[in-house]
Amino acid sequence: PASRGTVGARCVARATAWISCASAEDVVALLGRVREHAGDTVTSFEMLPAHAIDMVQADHPDVRDPNPSSLPWRVLCEISMAREEHARETLETALADALEVGLARDAVLAENLTQAADFWTIRESIPLSKRAYGTSVNHDVSVPVSRIPAFLNTAAAAVAEVAPDAEIVAFGHVGDGNLHYSACEPKGVASPTLGGISDRITAAVHREAMAHGGSISAEHGVGRLKRDELAGLRSPAATAAMQAIKRALDPQNIMNPGRVVPDQG
């Protein structure tokens, strides 16, 4: 339970749920429904594909899906409030509402901190378990929240044109539209091929992210690696405007030269 200490610090109490959803559209709508009840106290809302859970379980046989289901998506939702009982009641009410209208098909509310930590262990194990699964071509993109389902559909189709056998693993922070999007080599493939066509896969994913009003760099920045690609994906006028702003603010070009904005020749 939350309490105020002698230095005036307030502890934060959290309520955490593991939810099964039938579609990416339902995941996005579920976020809106939970926010109707919890507002800005929704501090985490992670969408996880069932295939990623399978990868974690293959890598860590002791890990169990808190709510086994044939549905394609899981959501790890957490709200944070001053009082534990208030957080739990709010999330329970939101989940009951979501279950009634079909946005959530099933849900497990963590009974204690240990169970909540177990939920998070699954989420945090995905990157390393994906690596153990095999070769993957990874991306860090963002799209407007409302466009997440459409992006997932068109990006999967675009990747399939380049790498028909690739397995897609997309997971991330629905609340801000940040997605970790990977094209993975099928398990046990005799001759891995994705590494040789990674540039084409990345171009396809990034093109779709931009087409949906998103960004090719969500959490990890643009830097030098994505600078030229980003310039190629936006209009010359947009690049020229950014260069003009850069010159006005940094006429000596001493702040991160050559990063994000291409140098003018």
List the predicted regions and their residue ranges.
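Noncatalytic alpha-helical scaffold of FAD-dependent oxidoreductases
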Residues: 1-265
